[in-house]
Structure formats: structure tokens, C-alpha cells
Amino acid sequence: LSSWHVVMLKYLFSYARMKNLKVIMTPSNSNSFISDETDGYYLLENGLADGVILLEHVYDDLRVKFLKERGIPFVIFGQVEDDDVCSVSLDNYYVGYKGGSYLIGRGYKYIEFLVGEERFDSNKLRVKGFQDATGKSDGIFNIRYGANTVDKAYRIAKGVLEEEKPDAFFVSGDERAIGVYRAIQEAGYSIPKDIAVLGVDNIPMGNYLHPRISTVDQDFESMARECVELLTKLIDGEDLGNRKTSVFLPSVIEREST
């Protein structure tokens, strides 16, 4: 589990406990299911669990099909195009837009944006926001997909720094920025004197990086509470009306890395 998952799950467990709900984590993902009693979807299919919160979403997600076919209540954490599903999300377009605009406003003209896998809707939206923020500015603005772990972010940043010296790295995840910090320091550069770094998430460890990382914040607690509230209402058979989609806006927290 990433640090993002740890923080989000902490709040989900806390609010679920307040609603007297028990939480089971499942190893199944958008591509496959484990069809034995160790998996949450086995419990769902056999009437031993009441609902689901999905913490990731891709187009044509097998889990969504499974849940819809069986009429099982579920909430997706993520922005979705399907009006028939209930979702809670950070405004990922605005994450990219806000981060890009902030760095341009700070005077950076060569920015490398490191994001995770392209197949995730959240990453596509962040890239679109970043492109819209930087599209009318003079400079170099590159998108680097595949930075979905600390090590991969390190390797991508290292590869960039072997060829170029950007003004700033915008990293889609504070934890992954650890790898970027290492690559910058190994290349003999200083943060932020030579190269700035902006992260996303505002996870607690960001305060312990040196220098402390500037980040695009997301309100984990409010989003977790909304996920549990909506799922509880669905389980109870309540009509949500126009409340099927909840989107939370991010904000930039400026620290020493920019």
C-alpha cells in the first residue's frame, strides 16, 4: 500500500466505525478477482457483505460490472463519466491545473510533470489540467507517465537529469517525490535553488522531507467521510437524488521545495 492508501484508509476505517460498519480490504483490482473466501468479492457474492468503496477506477472496470449486475451498493472514489454510479473525488483536472498554474506563477519555464499509469482516469484528468494551465505559456512542459512508485519516479527523474536540467518537477504524489529528491541530489543539484519540486496529496511524510515539500493538498478526512455517508445511504435504500457525485477542490500548500 502507498502512503496515500494508508492515510485514506485510516479515515475510512474511522468513519466506518462511527457507523458501526466493519471494513474488509480486498486484493481484487480492476482487472481480476480472487474467487475464494479470502476476498471481499466472494463475501459480497455470498451475501456476507453489504457494500463497497472502490479506491481506484479505470474505464471498463470489471468490479463495477460485477457490482451492477448483482445490485450491490457501491461508491467509487474517483471521477467517473457514468451518471448511474455514486462517486466521491478530488477534482483531478484542477489538481493538474492548479499545480501547473502555481509553478508558472513562480516563474518556472521548464517543468516536468511526473504522473502514474495513463490508464487511470485521475491521471488523464491531471494531465489535461496541467496542459490547459501551461498551454498559453512560453516554455517546455513535458508529461512523463509511469511514475507510479518511488523507484519509477526516481528512474524517470534520473533519466531526465542525465539529458536536461528542468526548472521544476511536478510529481503526482508526495511519496513518489522522494525518488525525485534523490535523483536531483545525486545529480548534484539543490532543491529549490537549482530545481523546484511540487508534490500532490499533502501526506504527513511531506513535512519530513528536506526541504519540506510544497504540495497540492487534498482533504482526506472530508472525502472519506463522504464516501462512508453515501455508501451507508445506499445500503439503507435511500434516494440520493442529485447527491450522487461529490467533488472536492484542492489547494496549494507552499513550503520550502518551491
Predicted regions span which residues?
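Short acidic/polar active-site loop segments enriched in Thr and Asp
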Residues: D50, Y108-Y110, P166-D167
